Amino acid sequence: MIGKEVTLQDIVLELNELQPEVQPVDLFCEEELPSEQQETEEELPERTAYKVVTPCGCCKVKLRIFVNATQFAIRTFQNLLFEELQLLCPECRGNCKHGGS
């Protein structure tokens, strides 16, 4: 650039002169993306049937329930049964008030 005013010739640069190895990329390449249905099928975690045996929270009679759950869900359910959740048998359920003691 010579002088006080900038000319277009001073600004326009040829890309090939600066980096001859740079080539334009075709964004419509031959790559095939999976359909949305295939993606959702792959993302679903595997479920397994489990038999859960736990004592009633009041009378301690053995209760059995059957669930279909993921590994994460059955571990979470197990932790709840050990810590904060108690299942009740039909007889004890009648003796308790809903939502309270």
From Swiss-Prot:
The keyword Cell membrane does not apply. Disulfide bonds: none annotated. Keywords: Activator, DNA-binding, Early protein, G1/S host cell cycle checkpoint dysregulation by virus, Host cytoplasm, Host nucleus, Host-virus interaction, Inhibition of host innate immune response by virus, Inhibition of host interferon signaling pathway by virus, Interferon antiviral system evasion, Metal-binding, Modulation of host cell cycle by virus, Oncogene, Transcription, Transcription regulation, Viral immunoevasion, Zinc, Zinc-finger. SUPFAM superfamilies: E7 C-terminal domain-like (SSF161234). It is found in: Host cytoplasm; Host nucleus. One of its GO terms (cellular component) is host cell cytoplasm. Residues 1-44 are annotated as: E7 terminal domain. InterPro entries: Papilloma_E7. Highly phosphorylated. Belongs to the papillomaviridae E7 protein family. Homodimer. Homooligomer. Interacts with host RB1; this interaction induces dissociation of RB1-E2F1 complex thereby disrupting RB1 activity. Interacts with host EP300; this interaction represses EP300 transcriptional activity. Interacts with protein E2; this interaction inhibits E7 oncogenic activity. Interacts with host TMEM173/STING; this interaction impairs the ability of TMEM173/STING to sense cytosolic DNA and promote the production of type I interferon (IFN-alpha and IFN-beta). This is Protein E7. It comes from Human papillomavirus 21. The gene is E7.
